[in-house]
């Protein structure tokens, strides 16, 4: 497999647009595995829509062991021609001010992936060359090999910028993408609106692909891609087990890392999908798994499905294991509030999720278990990330948080809070967790779900 990383100078540079167009243009001829740097769930779905292959996240905060991350990058790539990695934010943006703290640049260096920068050309000409020179000089170990100029207003505008880059830099220009307001993808509180909620998304992607074919030198891009080194042996040697795990999968619940799903299945877990929106009954399973998503967008339909809410509540009452992240916590609470509207949810946890106009939590965080719970025994450290526009409030003060949360930036604790709740064998929190962070932690998690892994 050849590999190449598309990174932005800043957020909003157009890297997602460029990646979607490149994926669509090359997918007609090549077998492509796409990746996304960082913890994002939504962009990956757009990739998968094009490639028909689960997109994988590359995150060296959530997966701190370099050998494990290298394995996740190279696994199952025997029949792949090209790996295309989309960066996150700007190239050097990560956690705090350290350019190597979980940034796209740190991934490029760690996995030795050549970088193609995307720069927004709006209202600039020669200054684009200065910006690019700054990016190249800022860290010479980052293999920046080319640039795509986005949001170009005219052919003359492109020639002006390209001329400046050629004059001051020895950096290949792969081409440009013209300004086109009709191809922009709408956003909401957690980033882009998911692809399956956009009726014209395929037309927009096709239009970007046409622009890529017309104005970007794809052969030059392919020539800059380098080969992946030999495959890494899976460092997670988890014994096989057997368990039927019901997994909530519909428009309200769909935030799952492809590698988490793969690891569960590889361990012998049988995943049985069900829809909290439309199914009247739970499948015959040993445990339940609710990922994140957008329950607030489908609150009325979730609230109206009394049959399934009752079965989920009774599942918990029967002391069967339930694990829930973010949107799953909102669903398992008593009420989901949006403005003046209150929607009754499952009611396992006597608390209310209330939507807020601004992000309440955003980014990487550390969780420390205060009691034995689904995620681990007391005193266990778990890394993850939170990203939500809601707050969960206990309606009964007997409901106590089981996690102490910390945000650490530049080696300083900048925020602490409490979160996560467990009643019987039901656990829910706002924390999103990557299962590949710690094999012992994962084995303990499986056993808490009801598996028997020694």
Swiss-Prot record:
Swiss-Prot/TrEMBL keywords: ATP-binding, Cobalamin biosynthesis, Glutamine amidotransferase, Ligase, Magnesium, Nucleotide-binding
Cofactor(s) demanded: Mg(2+)
PROSITE patterns per UniProt: GATASE_COBBQ
Entry-linked Gene3D superfamilies: 3.40.50.880, P-loop containing nucleotide triphosphate hydrolases
One BP term from GO: cobalamin biosynthetic process
UniProt-recorded Gene Ontology molecular function terms: ATP binding; cobyrinic acid a,c-diamide synthase activity
Active-site residues, record numbering mapped to chain: 326 (nucleophile)
Substrates-to-products reaction catalysed: cob(II)yrinate + 2 L-glutamine + 2 ATP + 2 H2O = cob(II)yrinate a,c diamide + 2 L-glutamate + 2 ADP + 2 phosphate + 2 H(+)
Site for Increases nucleophilicity of active site Cys, residues: 432
Pathway(s) the chain acts in: Cofactor biosynthesis; adenosylcobalamin biosynthesis; cob(II)yrinate a,c-diamide from sirohydrochlorin (anaerobic route): step 10/10
EC number per UniProt: 6.3.5.11
Start and end residues of each GATase cobBQ-type domain: 244-440
Keyword Ligase: yes
Homology family: Belongs to the CobB/CbiA family.
Task performed by this protein: Catalyzes the ATP-dependent amidation of the two carboxylate groups at positions a and c of cobyrinate, using either L-glutamine or ammonia as the nitrogen source.
Extra facts: The a and c carboxylates of cobyrinate are activated for nucleophilic attack via formation of a phosphorylated intermediate by ATP. CbiA catalyzes first the amidation of the c-carboxylate, and then that of the a-carboxylate.
HAMAP family on file: CobB_CbiA
Domain notes: Comprises of two domains. The C-terminal domain contains the binding site for glutamine and catalyzes the hydrolysis of this substrate to glutamate and ammonia. The N-terminal domain is anticipated to bind ATP and cobyrinate and catalyzes the ultimate synthesis of the diamide product. The ammonia produced via the glutaminase domain is probably translocated to the adjacent domain via a molecular tunnel, where it reacts with an activated intermediate.
Record protein name field: Cobyrinate a,c-diamide synthase
């Amino acid at each position: 497999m050849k590999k190449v990383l598309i990174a932005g100078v800043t957020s909003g540079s157009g890297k997602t647009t460029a990646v979607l167009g490149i994926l669509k243009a090359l997918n007609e001829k090549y077998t492509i595995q796409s990746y996304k740097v960082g913890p994002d769930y939504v962009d990956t779905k757009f990739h998968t829509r094009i490639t028909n292959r689960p997109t994988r996240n590359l995150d060296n905060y959530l997966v701190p062991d370099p050998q494990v991350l290298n394995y996740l990058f190279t696994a199952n790539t025997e029949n792949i021609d090209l790996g295309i990695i989309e960066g996150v934010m700007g190239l050097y943006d990560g956690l705090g001010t350290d350019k190597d703290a979980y940034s796209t640049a740190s991934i490029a260096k760690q996995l030795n992936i050549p970088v193609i920068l995307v720069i927004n050309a709006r209202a600039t000409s020669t200054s684009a060359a200065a910006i690019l020179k700054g990016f190249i000089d800022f860290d010479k170990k980052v293999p920046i090999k080319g640039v795509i100029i986005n949001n170009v207003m005219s052919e003359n505008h492109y020639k002006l910028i390209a001329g400046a880059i050629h004059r001051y830099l020895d950096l290949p220009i792969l081409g440009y993408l013209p300004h086109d307001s009709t191809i922009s993808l709408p956003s909401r509180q957690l980033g882009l609106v998911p692809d399956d909620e956009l009726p014209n998304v395929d037309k927009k992607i096709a239009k970007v692909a046409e622009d890529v074919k017309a104005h970007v030198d794809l052969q030059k891009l392919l020539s800059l891609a380098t080969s992946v080194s030999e495959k890494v042996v899976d460092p997670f040697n988890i014994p096989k087990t057997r368990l039927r795990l019901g997994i909530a999968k519909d428009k309200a619940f769909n935030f799952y890392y492809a590698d988490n799903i793969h690891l569960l299945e590889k361990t012998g877990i049988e995943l049985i999908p069900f829809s909290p929106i439309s199914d009247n009954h739970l499948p015959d399973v040993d445990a339940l798994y609710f990922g994140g998503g957008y329950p607030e967008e489908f609150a009325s339909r979730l609230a109206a499905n009394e049959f399934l809410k009752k079965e989920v509540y009774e599942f918990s009452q029967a002391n069967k294991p339930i694990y829930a992240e973010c949107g799953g916590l909102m669903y398992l609470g008593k009420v989901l509030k949006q403005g003046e509207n209150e929607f009754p949810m499952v009611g396992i946890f006597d608390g209310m999720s209330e939507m807020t106009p601004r992000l309440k939590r955003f980014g990487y965080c550390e969780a420390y278990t205060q009691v034995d719970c689904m995620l681990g025994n007391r005193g266990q450290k778990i890394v993850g990330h939170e990203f939500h526009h809601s707050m969960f409030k206990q309606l009964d003060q007997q409901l106590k948080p089981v996690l102490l949360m910390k945000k650490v930036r530049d080696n300083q604790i900048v925020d602490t809070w409490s979160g996560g709740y467990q009643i019987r064998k039901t656990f829910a929190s706002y924390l999103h967790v990557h299962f590949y962070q710690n094999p012992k932690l994962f084995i303990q998690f499986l056993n808490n779900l009801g598996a028997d892994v020694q």
